[in-house]
Amino acid sequence: MDGDYIKTLSSEERIIFLKIFCCLVRADRNIDAEEISFLKTIAARYGVDNNTVIGIIKMQNIDFVAEARKITNRGHALQLVKEMCVLANIDNDLADAELDIVIDCARAMGVEDEKIVLINRWVLDSLILTKTGQIIMEVNNG
């Protein structure tokens, strides 16, 4: 996760990102340790306290498309798509429901389908390189 963009997000945008991440985590009805770790890490990087995150996780009826439409800055939209792709792929199981949320949010922000594919490929390549590096360096990530 490249954190430079975080400094440019408003507090409202940070909450929007977290709401969408929580919808994505719940999409496949199987919340993995990697996904929880991602949420904790990103919330800390966004400067959002745990109580706020817990409150967001407990929200049942988040309209993620309406939330995504609030992101009007192109750079922020692309960063959100990237982070969503990381989160959706982090458990090595990209479910159809997760993919649907990524696509619906991206489209709501005006991100082209071709750009979504390119971002997802880049994220997958990065994840593969990271895992390969861990194997080469004999790093136990377990």
Name each region found by the language model.
Residues M1-V25, N30-G142:
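Small-residue-enriched hydrophobic alpha-helices in membranes
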